[in-house]
């Protein structure tokens, strides 16, 4: 046991300044303990004071608004020249130990939180008497309100009231005033506890309360019972960031498409559509025979045109088998062409005949697959007659145009006659002109151009004469 003595003491300073700080030997004169301002306006603080022995003293001082001061309410001593401090002895500390059992706040420098509560005991007799009086008043009110029909209920109530009277309380107040329900607190011996030693409750760290304590205090560290079995605690991997990035980037790269191989694939896909050399050529022999038969006929029809014989192509080879069916049509076409020449010799020139023959022969006897088209029909006698009568029709049209022009001129003349002024209007105009001449002889020079303007009607008369 150490021989140090500890007491709780309250330091105070009267109201007036803004800030008051307590300093002394307890903090090596650093001014670290500010006083708390109370509702009254003064400053107070309660803190534990330690003394090494009975003869030791506790030296302190106040810093009021930044100025070091000494209080007159405490004892003073001169330490050196010009330096004065307040001090406390053991006798001063013992006198203030009436509140030694009060609970204190260590974080606030030992400030008192309140006086110790009164030890629990049986309820006072005065409260019990008050409860009985109130119960009697309630009973009298219930009896006045009851009627004859409720006698049975009143009897049961009286029985219950008698039972309550034996115990001294009613059923309503049993829970609040019964001695059995109020637990007796264990008596605490305050004198045994040393002043300044705070009472700390024991902590129950059983297995049942460990989980709840973690939740109350917040999420704490998790202690696993079998850390050796978990792979994450034992396995450690060393990964190079550069190698990992290179490997991932290589996988992400996609080769760009090349234009060459794609074109070759499209050509190879289309190539089967062309005729192959392995196929049997059965129709070509017949086609060649038919072409030889057609060539002399073409020469007989078109002797003026000397064209080279067309070579057989795959398209011609496919379409030539149908030419055998068209041969009789070609003979009829030749006869019709001769008739057309005889009917149109007087109208068309010789040069146009040759050109038309060449065009028609080419259209009819070409080896293209358009041979199946319907042939052009020859012109009839009526159509040729209409072609010959075309000059007469044009003369009739010209006559009609001349007649229409003459009718338009007649209409214009009629409208001009309607616009001619009457004899009365002419007289009025002459009278007005004479008046103007008599009124202003100097205006003769100005009237000459006006006469020219009125000569328009004279011109119209000359035209109709």
Curated annotation (Swiss-Prot):
Composition bias, Basic and acidic residues: 337-363, 385-398, 404-428
Where are the compositionally biased (Acidic residues) regions?
Answer: 156-165
Q: Where is the composition biased (Low complexity)?
A: 166-177
A GO cellular-component term linked to this record: nucleus
Q: Sorted alphabetically, which SUPFAM superfamilies does this protein's record hold?
A: E set domains
Q: Which UniProt keywords apply?
A: DNA-binding, Phosphoprotein
Region span, Disordered = 107-227, 247-276, 298-465
Question: Quick check: keyword Cytoplasm in the entry?
Answer: no
Per the record, where are the segments of Basic residues compositional bias?
A: 127-151, 451-465
One of the record's GO molecular function terms: DNA binding
* Residues the record lists as Phosphoserine modifications: 153, 156, 271, 319, 343, 394, 440
Q: List Phosphothreonine occurrences by residue.
A: 182, 295, 366
Its job? Cruciform DNA-binding protein which exerts an enhancing effect on the cleavage of cruciform DNA (X-DNA) by endonuclease VII from bacteriophage T4.
Report the sequence similarity comment from the record.
Belongs to the CRP1/MDG1 family.
Q: What is this protein called?
A: Cruciform DNA-recognizing protein 1
Q: What is the species of this protein?
A: Saccharomyces cerevisiae (strain VIN 13)
Biological classification of the source = Eukaryota, Fungi, Dikarya, Ascomycota, Saccharomycotina
């Amino acid at each position: 046991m150490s021989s140090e003595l500890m007491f709780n003491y309250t330091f105070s300073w009267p109201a007036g300044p803004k800030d008051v700080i307590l300093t002394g030997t307890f903090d090596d004169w650093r001014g670290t303990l500010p006083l708390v301002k109370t509702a009254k306006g003064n400053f107070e603080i309660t803190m534990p004071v330690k003394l090494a022995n009975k003869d030791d003293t506790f030296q302190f001082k106040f810093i009021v608004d930044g100025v070091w001061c000494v209080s007159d309410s405490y004892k003073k001593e001169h330490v050196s020249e010009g330096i004065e401090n307040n001090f406390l002895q053991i006798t001063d500390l013992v006198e203030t130990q009436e509140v030694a059992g009060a609970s204190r706040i260590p974080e606030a420098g030992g400030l008192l939180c309140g006086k110790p509560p009164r030890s629990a005991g049986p309820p006072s007799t005065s409260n019990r008497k008050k409860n009985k009086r109130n119960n009697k008043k309630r009973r009298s009110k219930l009896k006045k309100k009851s009627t004859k029909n409720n006698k049975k209920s009143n009897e049961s109530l009286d029985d219950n009231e008698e039972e309550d009277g034996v115990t001294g309380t009613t059923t309503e107040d049993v829970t609040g005033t019964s001695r059995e329900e109020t637990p007796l607190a264990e008596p605490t011996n305050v004198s045994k506890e040393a002043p300044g030693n705070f009472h700390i409750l024991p902590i129950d760290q059983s297995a049942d309360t460990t989980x709840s304590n973690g939740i109350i205090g917040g999420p704490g560290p998790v202690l696993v019972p079998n850390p050796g079995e978990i792979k994450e605690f034992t396995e450690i991997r060393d990964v190079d960031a550069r190698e990992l990035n290179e490997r991932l980037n290589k996988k992400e790269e996609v080769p760009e498409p090349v234009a060459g191989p794609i074109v070759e694939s499209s050509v190879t896909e289309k190539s089967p559509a062309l005729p192959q050399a392995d196929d049997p050529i059965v129709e070509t022999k017949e086609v060649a025979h038919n072409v030889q038969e057609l060539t002399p006929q073409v020469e007989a029809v078109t002797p003026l045109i000397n064209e080279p014989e067309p070579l057989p192509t795959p398209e011609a080879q496919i379409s030539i088998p149908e030419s055998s069916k068209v041969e009789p049509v070609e003979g009829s076409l030749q006869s019709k062409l001769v008739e057309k020449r005889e009917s149109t010799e007087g109208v068309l020139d010789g040069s146009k005949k040759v050109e038309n023959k060449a065009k028609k022969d080419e259209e009819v006897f070409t080896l293209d697959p358009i041979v199946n088209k319907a042939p052009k029909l020859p012109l009839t006698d009526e159509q040729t007659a209409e072609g010959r009568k075309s000059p007469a029709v044009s003369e009739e049209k010209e006559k009609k145009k001349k007649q229409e022009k003459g009718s338009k001129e007649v209409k214009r003349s009629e409208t001009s006659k309607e616009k001619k002024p009457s004899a009365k209007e002419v007289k009025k105009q002459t009278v007005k002109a004479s008046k103007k001449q008599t009124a202003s002889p100097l205006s003769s020079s100005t009237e000459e151009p006006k006469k020219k303007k009125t000569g328009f009607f004279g011109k119209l008369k000359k035209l109709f004469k």
